[in-house]
Amino acid sequence: MAFDPLSLAYHEAGHAIVARHFGCELIDIFISLDDQCGGATVTVCGLNEWQKGLIALAGCAAEVLAGHAVADDPDRAWEYLKDANDAQQAVGEITGLDIGDDGFRNAYDALEAEAEELIRRPPIWSAIVALAAVLAERHAVDGATAMSIIDPILSGFADHSQGASAPQPELSGTA
């Protein structure tokens, strides 16, 4: 099964740009068109659970915003499930709630809405578009190349400098 390179590229670019926004060093980003991997973004940094959840949800959010989402494609369902599981783990760590507890879904939805809002910020979205274009063409980008593409775009973004020490918002699990 071959996947759409632009869809995969937006997905991985979403993860990479949000990770970079939080101060992560990008090591490698790649997409794979014909295996079950789909792609991966490899980073080095210390993150809090909130940031990990935002990064996990940013991939699908970027794909949807770009109009390339294939979330209902059973061949890619595992990829979305892994990201959702990572975000659920983050919500559990933040709130102390288990997936079936009252309020868990509200907290998850709040994290998801924040990821969607974050990638809509013009510098972040511009960086996602720029990196996705390169990824769709090359299928792999090393971290230094990726950062040389996106850092000039993000440098004008006021809160990009907050890095990995960004405060964690309160996700109480209630709406």
Task: Give the role of each language-model region.
Residues 2-175:
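Soluble catalytic regions of large protease machineries
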